[in-house]
Curated annotation (Swiss-Prot):
One of its GO terms (cellular component) is plasma membrane. This is Energy-coupling factor transporter transmembrane protein EcfT. Keywords: Cell membrane, Membrane, Transmembrane, Transmembrane helix, Transport. GO terms for molecular function: transmembrane transporter activity.
């Protein structure tokens, strides 16, 4: 499962999405998160699905690779689906076994919410797959620039969020290594009662925290060795340039939002 985690990883490429301004991608994610909540029927979710598939194809990232990244969250999606089936009692009963009843409203809502979750995960994952940590930092810093008037450390906030994203796959790899080392010593993480499996995770947490702090210290030393002193006076090797392609992407999102609004039930 740890090998399936792709959030935070960068896949080099020359696709249209790779070449977009990072600010465009960050704005796109923010708008998409808002747009997703406009969907409330088959037509709107189908339109969102077509948009998501279109974006995935433009990145040229193998679809099988993205599906592999969904494995860690498949249980959350299934739990969400089952929760809506059990808790939503709307519409006619379409299936019944004893006291267990499945209502049409519960089934529909379960499918819709699960699709919404998958769409959001796919689109947000594409940010790190097509954008380097430096580009994410620069993009966030530019978008948060107005907050400098409030004396907020914009560069430091952007850098902190970028490092957090970058460290997700690193921590997953460390967790995988520690789990394999513990399993070689006879620890079983996959079988037995839930209580026993929870106990087995405790010895995993201590070395993981130690490793995380060690890596954070190494990163801090490396930044100091390179003369990093915050955002003030920092120069950039590449400046962000907004092009017509970026404007077209934002316009297409606005059109998508308008279509979803008119297709709403």
């Amino acid at each position: 499962m740890m090998d399936s985690m792709i959030i935070g990883k960068y896949v080099p490429g020359t696709s249209l999405v790779h070449r977009l301004d990072p600010r465009t991608k960050l704005i796109t994610i923010f708008l998409f998160v808002c747009i997703v909540f406009l969907a409330n029927n088959v037509q709107t979710y189908a339109l969102l699905g077509l948009f998501t598939i279109g974006v995935v194809s433009l990145t040229r990232v193998p679809f099988s690779f993205l599906m592999k990244g969904l494995k860690p969250i498949i249980w959350i999606v299934l739990f969400t689906f089952l929760l809506h089936i059990l808790m939503t009692h709307e519409g006619p009963i379409i299936f019944q076994i004893g006291f267990f009843k499945v209502y049409e409203g519960g089934l529909v809502q379960g499918i819709f919410i699960s699709l919404r979750f998958v769409y959001l995960i796919l689109i947000t994952t594409l940010l790190t797959l097509t954008t380097t940590p430096i580009e994410i930092t620069d993009g966030m810093e530019q978008l948060l620039n107005p907050l400098k008037k409030l004396k907020l450390p914009v560069h430091e906030l952007a850098l902190m969020m970028s490092i957090s994203l970058r460290f997700i796959p690193t921590l997953m790899e460390e967790t995988d290594k520690i789990m394999k080392a513990q399993m070689a010593r006879g620890v079983d993480f996959t079988s037995g009662p839930v209580k026993e499996r929870v106990k087995a995770i405790v010895p995993l947490l201590v070395p993981l925290f130690v490793s995380a702090f060690k890596r954070a210290e190494e990163l801090a030393v490396a930044m100091e060795a390179r003369g990093y002193q915050g955002g003030e006076g920092r120069t950039k090797y590449r400046k962000l340039v907004w092009t017509g392609k970026d404007t077209s992407v934002i316009v297409s999102l606005i059109v998508l939002a308008a279509l979803l609004f008119f297709l709403r039930a």
